Amino acid sequence: MEEGSSSPVSPVDSLGTSEEELERQPKRFGRKRRYSKKSSEDGSPTPGKRGKKGSPSAQSFEELQSQRILANVRERQRTQSLNEAFAALRKIIPTLPSDKLSKIQTLKLAARYIDFLYQVLQSDEMDNKMTSCSYVAHERLSYAFSVWRMEGAWSMSASH
């Protein structure tokens, strides 16, 4: 327990910190993470370093702008990848024609569909002929899942 309080992250022991210092620490650590390249050049984020950020040179402004552009590109790619994954998931899950599923609804329905398929595999209700034709098997499962949903085994809430 003593070793955790004297970690390298907080150089001052918890006994020697005032409330004011504790309030400043999260802000300082937040800035250090945000400007990790800048603060790691000289080893520590100092108040003098903040003064230089107030009047950035043309090079640092361009550098920050290019970093922001790259971050935006990465975020767009991540969002596009996520949307493509949800589109693929929506194609797999049997839905009703009236369904306009949000992402959370899609995930919840997918989880319920997996549970439904597991129950189907565990039961002897389906005969072995279904495995001979995957298209027919998929259509039967889709129909059975739709009936299962309509019977109220799983109701979709509009608030989710």
UniProtKB/Swiss-Prot annotation:
A cellular component term, taken from the record's GO annotations: nucleus
One GO biological process term: negative regulation of macrophage cytokine production
Compartment(s) where it occurs, according to its Swiss-Prot or TrEMBL record: Nucleus; Cytoplasm
Molecular-function annotations in GO: chromatin binding; DNA-binding transcription factor activity; DNA-binding transcription factor activity, RNA polymerase II-specific; protein dimerization activity; protein domain specific binding; RNA polymerase II transcription regulatory region sequence-specific DNA binding
Entries under Pfam families matching the protein: HLH (PF00010)
Region feature (Disordered): 1-63
Residues in bHLH domain copies: 66-117
TM stretches of this protein: none
Biased composition range(s): Basic residues: 27-37
Keywords: Cytoplasm, Developmental protein, Differentiation, DNA-binding, Nucleus, Repressor, Transcription, Transcription regulation
Assembly and interaction partners: Efficient DNA binding requires dimerization with another bHLH protein. Forms a heterodimer with TCF3/E12. Also interacts with MEF2C.
General function of this protein: Binds to the E-box consensus sequence 5'-CANNTG-3' as a heterodimer and inhibits transcriptional activation by MYOD1, MYOG, MEF2A and MEF2C. Also represses expression of pro-inflammatory cytokines such as TNFA and IL1B. Involved in postnatal glycogen storage and energy metabolism. Inhibits the premature or ectopic differentiation of preosteoblast cells during osteogenesis, possibly by changing the internal signal transduction response of osteoblasts to external growth factors.
UniProt cross-references to PANTHER family, sorted A to Z: BASIC HELIX-LOOP-HELIX TRANSCRIPTION FACTOR, TWIST, TWIST-RELATED PROTEIN 2
Name the UniProt record assigns to this protein: Twist-related protein 2
